[in-house]
A protein has these predicted regions:
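N-terminal, active-site-proximal structural segment of metallo-dependent hydrolase catalytic domains
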Residues: 2, 6-141, 145-146, 153-174
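Surface-exposed cleft-lining segments at the edges of enzyme active sites
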Residues: 89-96, 123-127, 193-201, 228-237
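A well-ordered secondary-structure block
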Residues: 158-222, 226
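Metal-dependent phosphoesterases centered on the DNase I-like endonuclease/exonuclease/phosphatase
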Residues: 233-234, 238-339, 378
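Intrinsically disordered, low-complexity repeat and linker tracts
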Residues: 372-378
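Solvent-exposed loop/turn segments at secondary-structure junctions
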Residues: 74-75, 124-127, 156-160, 185-186, ...
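Active-site beta-strand/loop signature of hydrolases that rely on acidic residues for catalysis
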Residues: 66-72, 103-132, 180, 212, ...
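Conserved beta strand-loop-helix elements of the APE1-like EEP
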Residues: 141-145, 171-188, 215, 327-342, ...
Length: 378
């Protein structure tokens, strides 16, 4: 073989190498996309959940109770944590110790109000993003040490391994809703919410709410609903569809004469005007804080927004570390109650987002309609 032919052959080989690299990248990327979609499955609707605990107590009409709603942000969000899906940088909690510290502190915060009921959201049970910490176990152990509580867990999603960001993939996530009750939870049900379709469902993940039944001494039931509506990959129509499904279940229970309390992270501007209140002059719009559609709330139900100590935001935008008075904040979390539940006090508590990207909401209530005093002129 001549020198000219050898040189020509070498050039041909070098020319093939980048093509092979491109082909391998395409095959790997295609294989990953196929894995994500083929491994995708939704948890079944109307799934019976198994409450745990030894409480045998029934709730009473006319007695004051305290309930807390708290999104724990899967134990990652210290006040300087920024999240990649919110234009921030980080995709995982900084360390296992940081996760444990955040969950311990947020749980202690909830317990500090001596609650009768607590609705937690974003509780991880073995996720890459939270360093495989079993957050449910930490919370349950603390509540067991504080008194006699029943608890029930509803898994929101079990996602495929997300290979993004490339430098530190978000990984696989397994997370859900955890309800705590001093009173006997006789049964609980997981309802699957309508979510995005197509590629968007990978971002939206699965969504659900849990319906827990607690007997009341008058023969009725207290229906506790723990929910976390979609934040990403959604639009107004889908958000309304989720609320309409939720409201249909709430109304069905109210029509039976039961007492209904729904709490959690609604991923809407809960008071409708909190975005402008906390961020005057802002032109920012996000799908997770569109105004709450008050017009679809069914008759017989009320949002609890008469805050005893004024407006306090319940979440921050995590594109940057939290700076009071500068960071974008809004009210997403709260309670909606049936008319046979009297809200005696409600307040969002300013915890400066030190251990989660949400602030807790505390409500005191009684079962039974508020008494009204009529006056007559003589």
């Amino acid at each position: 073989m001549s020198d000219k032919e050898k040189t020509k052959k070498k050039k041909f080989r070098w020319w093939k190498i980048p093509l092979w690299i491109i082909l391998i990248v395409i095959l790997v990327a295609g294989g990953y996309v196929a894995y994500v979609f083929l491994s995708y499955s939704r948890i079944e609707d109307n799934l019976a959940l198994q409450p745990e605990g030894n409480s045998t107590e029934k709730a009473k009409v006319g007695e004051e109770y305290t309930i807390v709603s708290y999104n724990l942000g899967f134990g990652a969000y210290t006040d300087d944590f920024t999240f990649f899906m919110d234009e921030g940088k980080e995709s995982r909690a900084r360390s296992k110790d940081s996760v444990i510290n955040c969950i311990n502190n947020t749980t202690d915060t909830a317990l500090s109000y001596n609650p009768d009921f607590v609705l937690f959201q974003e509780v991880d049970i073995g996720s890459t993003r939270s360093h495989q910490v079993e957050e449910r176990n930490i919370i349950n152990e603390k509540f067991a040490a504080a008194g006699t509580y029943d608890n029930v867990f509803a898994q929101n999603y079990n996602s495929a391994y997300l290979m993004y960001p490339i430098t530190e993939p978000h990984g696989a996530s397994k997370s859900g809703l955890l309800t705590q009750s001093r009173f006997d939870i006789t049964s609980s049900l997981r309802r699957s919410l309508p979510i995005a379709t197509g590629f968007k469902k990978v971002l939206d993940l699965d969504r659900c709410y849990s319906i827990s039944r607690i007997p009341v001494e008058d023969g009725k039931e207290l229906i506790l609903i723990d929910q976390h509506l979609s934040a990403y990959g959604t639009d107004a129509a889908q958000g309304n569809a989720q609320l309409e499904m939720l409201f249909a279940d709430m109304k069905a229970e109210y029509d039976k004469g039961n007492y209904v309390i729904c709490g959690g992270d609604f991923n809407h501007d809960f008071t409708v005007g909190s975005k402008e209140y906390f961020n005057p002059g802002t032109d920012k719009t996000y799908t997770w804080c569109e105004p709450f559609p008050d017009d679809i709330i069914p008759d017989g139900f009320t949002k609890c927004t008469d805050y005893a100590e004024g407006m306090i935001p319940t979440t921050r935008y995590t594109n940057e570390p939290y700076v009071p008075g500068k960071s974008f904040t809004v009210i997403l979390d709260g309670f909606i109650v049936s008319d046979n539940v009297t809200c005696k006090y409600v307040q969002n508590i300013d915890k400066a987002f030190k251990y989660t990207d949400h602030n807790p909401v505390v409500m005191k209530f009684e079962l039974g309609k508020a008494e009204t005093t009529e006056t007559t002129e003589e």
